Amino acid sequence: MDWFHCNQCFRKDGAHFFVTSCGHIFCKKCVTLEKCAVCGTACKHLALSDNLKPQEKMFFKSPVETALQYFSHISQVWSFQKKQTDLLIAFYKHRITKLETAMQETQQALVSQDKELSVLRKENGELKKFLAILKESPSRYQGSRSITPRPVAITSPSQSVTPRPSFQHSSQVVSRSSSVESVPYREAGFGSLGQGGRGLQGRRTPRDSYNETPSPASTHSLSYRPSSASSGQGIFSFRPSPNGHSGHTRVLTPNNLAQRESRTTLESLPSFQLPVLQTPYQQQRQMGLPSGREAWTTSR
């Protein structure tokens, strides 16, 4: 220590030196007990020896040695703190990795839910539109479900009706009617039968306004007879010929026409053709019979 000397006489050699509380060094000759000889302040004195305390010895050591000692301590402190910091960083890195994985899964689920939500919104909009249409016109959809197509009987126009030669009248030809509504079955009286026949000839639909040629090969017959002179009602009787397969007779009167019309139509019968209506006077002239009410039959 080349810096060590007495602050009063500046000597370096000697065995006994003292240091004051005010920071001055004195040799044994220059030291004063009352006050410091350099600054004149009251102070305490401490004799320098090898038995000094560590906090007192540190002032007489080399700064490099003190620095190395402190650097070693600082390095230990820094290593300890760095180790703790590394552990904390590793924990945060692991946690960040887990959070990133969870975030990716959440994003995928969110995309899937967005697609499903868009589909549900589209379906909901369509259902709302359909519900609005149903609220506006509910009877139209209910009516369309309740209406079912009904079969329509169609008679081939190639089939024809042939009256008997003795009863055929060239001036009266009755066209086939397409439905039961176009045939007037009500007669005002037996005397107006000719007028009713002309009315049947006049009421024709455009599709059925053609004449048919009678055929002698017909197997069915149609007859008309008045029920009584006073009632003024006619009876149409459909009966097959002796060569036919059916053995029953169908009778249509103006009274039960409405009931028959609800169950079947005349066109549903096989090859139905309207008869040639004649007055009793014309029948008597053709047959050469005396006056009287007799049934007339038209072969089909």
Curated annotation (Swiss-Prot):
It catalyses: S-ubiquitinyl-[E2 ubiquitin-conjugating enzyme]-L-cysteine + [acceptor protein]-L-lysine = [E2 ubiquitin-conjugating enzyme]-L-cysteine + N(6)-ubiquitinyl-[acceptor protein]-L-lysine. A zinc finger (RING-type) spans 6-40. Autoubiquitinated. Pathway: Protein modification; protein ubiquitination. It comes from the Eukaryota. The keyword Zinc applies. GO terms for cellular component: synaptonemal complex. Ubiquitin E3 ligase that acts as a crucial factor for crossing-over (CO) formation during meiosis. Essential for normal prophase I progression and for ensuring appropriate CO designation in meiosis. Recruits key components of the cross-over machinery either directly ou indirectly, leading to the activation of the MutL-gamma complex. The function of RNF212B in CO designation is dependent on its catalytic activity. This is E3 ubiquitin-protein ligase RNF212B. It comes from Pongo abelii. The gene is RNF212B.
